[in-house]
Amino acid sequence: MSFKREGDDQSQLNILKKRRVSDLLSNFIPDDEATLMKNGRYSCLVCSHRPVFDTVDMLVVHRKGKRHLEGMKWFYGKKNQLRREIDKRRHQDYVKAEDDRQEPSSSAPLLTQTRKITHHALLRTVPYSSCHKKASERSESSSKEHRNDLANSHLSMRTESNDSRTTVHQGPSEVKGEAKKKKKGASTLSSSVCEPLTEQRRRELDHYLKLKSSGWLQDRSGKWVKDENVEFDSDEEEPTLLPPCSESS
């Protein structure tokens, strides 16, 4: 039989709720399988039609019935499915967070590009790239060859100048000996152009240095062209040629 409360005293209602909760705990009924309603009755949360009982004893008898046991299978099957779905979502979120940590951030492409440039700069050899364009390779190689030709021509002129200075101080026999030793070395100008030979070399060196200081550059074919970074006073398209040496009497 059910307990009926008389009056509206809040203390009596609290005492009644406390006693009914104690009854639930004493019968080992989980909180997610039954609940205490506001009117003091018990409701079964396992069954889909939510039956209501006046006392705990009636709820215990209902829980032993066949219909309730079938409902428990469906109830816990649904609960386990929900738990597996939650675990699956958590695992997916965890994997996604780990992938985002490992991959570089797309919000900072400049930082990523800077790291790649720094990495390639520290390498001893240039890494192979199948996407590298052949035209760029040709332009880079031609520019390197142009710079190497300019450096070699300047070095050869300096070598010729040093040879001309040492030749002035040496005697005729020493000059012949040095000429035989350096016969396979740097190319020399023909002695039939003008006399003496050392004076012609010095004039060519002075002319070369004068053109370089004026802003002229020598390309691979030996032609003089204007430097784009230098301002010229006149509109001359070609530099002044080296005047021929006057014949000695």
From Swiss-Prot:
- Protein localization: Nucleus, Nucleoplasm; Nucleus speckle
In this chain, composition skew of type Basic and acidic residues spans: 94-103, 134-149
Q: Where is this region: Disordered?
A: 94-116, 128-199, 228-249
Q: Could you say which residue ranges form the zinc fingers (Matrin-type)?
A: 42-74
Q: Name one GO cellular component term.
A: nucleus
List the biased-composition ranges (Polar residues): 104-115, 150-170
Bias (Acidic residues) occurs at 230-239
Pfam families (alphabetical)? SCNM1_acidic, zf-SCNM1
Keywords annotated in UniProt: Metal-binding, mRNA processing, mRNA splicing, Nucleus, Spliceosome, Zinc, Zinc-finger
- UniProt motif Bipartite nuclear localization signal: location: 4-20
The record's InterPro entries line, in alphabetical order, gives: SCNM1, SCNM1_acidic, Znf-SCNM1
Q: Which PANTHER family match?
A: SODIUM CHANNEL MODIFIER 1 (PTHR32297:SF1)
Q: What is this protein called?
A: Sodium channel modifier 1
